[in-house]
């Protein structure tokens, strides 16, 4: 089998980030569930100064809950699981950040990997 190449064009907003997380998920130390990828991808999709300062603020949590039809408890459970898996972490100042190894390039992301038998 030769090299497999596939380009994905037209992924917008959270779909871009969810697809990115789905592609890298098998390579993570602890895989994220589909819903965890959806929650994190939605948070990753927010833009602007406010999002850059506090992406997990009450305002953005409300947006995620509405977009994904989650209860307060449901979102809290997913955020706890993401913390436990190292995908997000709480900083000394109390803000929550996304692990840098999960962040894709903004407009397009390239992937390259190889599997070797034996």
Task: Show where each model-derived region lies.
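A short, conserved structural fragment
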Residues: 80-96
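Short amphipathic alpha-helical interaction segments
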Residues: 69-84
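Short, amphipathic alpha-helical interaction segments positioned at domain boundaries
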Residues: 103-118
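Long, low-complexity, charged/polar intrinsically disordered regions in eukaryotic proteins
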Residues: 1-28
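Short, conserved sequence motifs enriched in acidic/basic residues, glycine, and aromatics
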Residues: 30-31, 69
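Short helix-coil junctions and helix-kink-helix linkers
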Residues: 59-73
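Short helix->loop/beta-hairpin flanking segments within DNA-binding domains
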Residues: 32-60
């Amino acid at each position: 089998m030769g090299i497999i190449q596939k380009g994905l064009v037209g992924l917008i907003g959270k779909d871009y980030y969810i697809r990115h997380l789905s592609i890298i998920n098998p390579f993570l130390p602890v895989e994220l569930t589909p819903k965890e990828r959806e929650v994190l991808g939605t948070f990753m999709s927010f833009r602007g100064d406010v999002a850059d300062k506090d992406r997990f603020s009450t305002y953005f949590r409300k947006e995620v809950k509405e977009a994904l039809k989650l209860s307060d408890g449901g979102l809290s459970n997913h955020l706890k699981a993401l913390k436990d898996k190292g995908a997000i972490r709480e900083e000394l100042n109390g803000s929550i950040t996304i692990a840098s190894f999960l962040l894709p390039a903004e407009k397009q992301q390239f992937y390259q990997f190889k599997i070797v038998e034996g």
